[in-house]
Amino acid sequence: MTSYNPASPDFPFTLGIEEEYQVVDPQTRELRSYITQILDRGKMILREQIKPELHQSMVEVGTHPCRTIQEARAEVVRLRSIIAGLARQHGLTIISAGTHPISSWMSQEITPFERYKGVVEEMQQLALQLLIFGMHVHVGMPDDEVAIELMNVARYFLPHILALSTSSPFWMGRNTGFKSYRSALFANFPRTGIPPSFHSAAEFHNYVNLLIRTNCIDDAKKIYWDLRPHPYFGTLEFRVCDAATRVDECIALAALMQALTVKLHLMFSENTTFRVYRRAVIMENKWRAQRWGLDGKLIDFGKRAEVDARALMYELVAFVDEVLDELGSRQEVEYLLKIAEGGSSADRQLAVFRETNDLNAVVDNLIVETLEGVPAYQA
C-alpha cells in the first residue's frame, strides 16, 4: 500500500523544484549575458544543481529530491542565496519572473553549446525570441502507469496553477495585456501546452517512440507539455508555472502540486473517479488564466458555469485539504489564499507600474521580492 507520510521509507511522492533566474545589471536594469562567468564558480559549489540555458542571461538551478516542503524551502533559499551571491561578485543580481519587463531578446547572446545550437537551427527566430523563465516542479511517481493516470486528471488543474503563478505581464517595454505572456510566447513552440490524455503508459511510450522514429524529436525531453512524465527522473513534471518571484510563492505552488498529486492518487486508491476532460476544454481555461490571471473567470466544467478565479482557488485548497496535515504542508498550501486575495507577481508588477509609470521601478521591485527572506551568501 502506498504511504502518504513523507517520513515513511515507502513514500514515493518526493518533490524537486527547478527555477530559471534572470541575470540582471542592477544599474541599467537590463539582462546581462553573463552566465558563463557565473557557471565557472557555480559548478564548483553546486555541481549538477546549476546549469546554463539557451540564453546567456538565464541560469537554471534545481533542488535535490526532497521529502517535505520544508526541505524544499531550505533548498530554494540556499540556491537563491548562492546564485545571487555569485552574481553580486560580478556587479549583477538575479530576478525570478516569467519575463523581463524591458530587455529585448535581440540583445541576448546564445549559450555556445551544441544542444542550444541545435535548438536554434531547428526553431530559428522562435528560439531566439524565447526569452522566458519558468518554474518546474517534479513529484515522484510509484511507476509509469500511475504517472499517466495522474497526468490525465491533473491536467484539469493546470490553468488554476498558472493563474496563481502569473508573473509576466510586460515584454520588451510594453504592457502586453496578459498576466502570463510567457505562456503565450511558449505556445509558439511545438509540443507545448496542455498534454493529451493517454489510456496507458504503453500508449504514451508508443507515442514518444513514434516521434523519435520519424525524426520529430531525438529525445523525450523535447516534449515540452505543461505536465509530462519525465523521461529519466521517474517523476511527474509540472511545467505550467511562470517563474515564482517570492520564495513563499514558489514553495506554496510546489506544495500545492505535491498535495494535488497525492490527493488524486488517494482518490484512485479508494476507487473514486475524477473525470478526464478533453484537452480542448482545458485549453479554454488556460487561455483565460494566461490572459486575466486571478482577475478573470475560469470555467467549472462540472457545473458548466463560469466562476471567479479567486473563488476557485478556495475550492482548490479545500479539495486537497485532507492530505495537507500528513504531508506537513498546510501552512504552505494555505498561503495560496493570500495570493488569491492579494494578487500574483503579475498583479504587483502592474500595480507598481500604475503608481510610478516607470518600468525601471518594476525591475527594482522584482529584485527586492526575489531576494526577500534570502540571506546574503558568504563564500
From Swiss-Prot:
Keywords from UniProt, A to Z, are: ATP-binding, Ligase, Nucleotide-binding
Against Pfam families, the record matches this protein to: GCS2 (PF04107)
* Superkingdom of source: Bacteria
User: Which InterPro entries does the protein's record reference?
Assistant: GCL_type2/YbdK_subfam, GCS2, Gln_synth/guanido_kin_cat_dom, YbdK
Cite the GO molecular-function annotations of the record. ATP binding; glutamate-cysteine ligase activity
Q: Which Gene3D superfamilies match?
A: 3.30.590.20
GO BP, sorted A to Z: modified amino acid biosynthetic process
Q: Reaction catalysed?
A: L-cysteine + L-glutamate + ATP = gamma-L-glutamyl-L-cysteine + ADP + phosphate + H(+)
Q: What is its EC number?
A: 6.3.2.2
Known role: ATP-dependent carboxylate-amine ligase which exhibits weak glutamate--cysteine ligase activity.
Q: Which family does it belong to?
A: Belongs to the glutamate--cysteine ligase type 2 family. YbdK subfamily.
- What name has this protein been given in UniProt? Putative glutamate--cysteine ligase 2
* Species annotation: Roseiflexus sp. (strain RS-1)
